[in-house]
């Protein structure tokens, strides 16, 4: 169904090939995972399959690529669209409508299906992706994970024979990732051919037929997921592969009371916020402490209020009620803005400069930066300093945004899904950097679905449910076990709120 034969591709303006002598066959009905570190060439391989290369990305190709017997370089993209459906890493790049129902039906309308068939497919797609409650919602009101799920539903409605998925789990919570695995398994049972670029392989366990490891554009080896399961932690860090299941074997004794941790904190006192007058509260926090000198995880399902809370804390929005208190009393929006730096969930919103170096220097303002080259080294950005940020992979863009936050020297650093698109080794490096920042007395908040990251570096965690604090406390093994179980189960009709544990 898909065949690469000695394919070498270099983007226009680049002398370094993104793929080198790449050969791979994917049979009809197979599920194959492309894996490897950020920037290794996974997305380039996908673009050669779905026609994005050469229709949207120019460059030179030697060797050949074939999809269902067609050469993507020789046929029109609309011809491939009837065969290949794609879910991109950033769902915003494939939205054309303003509401979810119109978005999911858009592809079917372009296929000129009759109204009744479109309605049937749309209902089926919402049901299969487990997002029936999002039908008819505004795209602009959705969380990042909800947007990704809608993007998947819009492709599913078109019933392509080949699915190309570019890190589809990157913005999803644990329950949604489990649901995604179920969806992909269902597609495979129906005979679809699936090519996935991923760092997280756990949800594909039992679904993927094999994993293909790419390093520096070259196919290094093919593995079963059982081979991945047997990999050591060091081998996963070298190859960028996540563990199949979250590891809880690290030293998780509470780090909150270790010597050197600051006792300063920002107190959220009866903080409430709603997006529209007369609407229900998107955030309703009775009491929560943000500790300086610690790394705090903000957890919860998609739409739980995590990003809304981070905006309130950073002074980007004004709460309808309540106060945020510092050492000297209430903190105004202006004061919180001055002391905070936010790395957004979609980092494309905050990349402005023509080079990586200028982007990071912009965040530093007039202040001097020490150790900038060391930061580039830690985040694997060496050699990319003069590249345009928008030319980088999703994981590399995320690393640039993290480097910019470090350069800002703000007291409160808020990272919204900082490991989205990051491979295992870069996640570990980000975790070490977050700990180092906290040791310097700053507050680090990590809004995340990534429990591997939480286990690696977080001192405290708060779990939000419908905008309120469900549980708060130090990160230890028992908390992680509870959090993973909670985030994987459906509590839409339950009342599980607990008192604060710290």
What are the language-model segments listed below?
Residues 50, 314:
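Helix-to-loop junction immediately C-terminal to a conserved catalytic motif
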Residues 58-70, 322-336, 471:
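Conserved ABC transporter NBD signature motif
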Residues 116-134, 369-384:
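Conserved ABC ATPase "signature" region
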Residues 138-142, 146, 388-392, 396:
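Conserved ABC ATPase signature
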Residues 163-166, 413-416:
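Catalytic Walker B motif of ABC-type/P-loop ATPase nucleotide-binding domains
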Residues 198-199, 448-449:
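H-loop/switch region of ABC-family ATPase nucleotide-binding domains
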Residues 218-240, 468-490:
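Conserved beta-strand-loop-alpha-helix hinge in the C-terminal portion
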